[in-house]
């Protein structure tokens, strides 16, 4: 069974989108990656789309999501890719939280 990983950053427009795209592309046989933001923007940063496209990963159809979308899901790991106060945010259930600032 694939391990579920959720990447979270401030806007879900850059770092978390890159992490989700790379993990699914290279290790999609072992992991199922998702991403969300604490304060999502309206669209993914165009440079994020461009950089991933350069290595063969297409995320042009992705839109930033709020972390609450995954409130009722359970993840094997949540990776926090920002420096943000998480006290005011309800995170999904997980076995492990990793902070990468």
Could you tell me what each predicted segment is?
Residues 2-68:
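Conserved active-site segments centered on acidic
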Residues 11-13, 83-86:
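Short glycine-rich anion-binding loops that position phosphate/pyrophosphate groups of nucleotides
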Residues 37, 82, 99-101:
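Residues at the C-termini of beta-strands that transition into short coil/loop
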Residues 41-44, 85-89:
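Short, charged/polar "capping" segments at the starts of alpha-helices
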Residues 75-76:
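Local beta-strand N-terminus motif with an aromatic residue
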Residues 79:
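N-terminal Rossmann-like NAD(P) cofactor-binding module of classical short-chain dehydrogenase/reductase
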Residues 86-101:
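Phosphate-binding/catalytic loops
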């Amino acid at each position: 069974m694939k391990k579920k990983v959720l990447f979270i950053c401030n806007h879900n427009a850059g770092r978390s989108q890159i992490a989700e795209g790379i993990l699914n592309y290279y290790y999609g046989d072992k992991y199922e990656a998702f991403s969300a933001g604490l304060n999502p923007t309206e669209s993914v940063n165009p440079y994020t789309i461009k950089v991933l496209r350069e290595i063969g990963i297409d995320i042009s159809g992705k839109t930033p999501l709020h972390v609450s979308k995954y409130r009722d899901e359970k993840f094997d790991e949540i990776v926090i890719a920002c420096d943000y106060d998480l006290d005011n945010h309800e995170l999904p259930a997980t076995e492990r939280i990793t902070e990468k600032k």
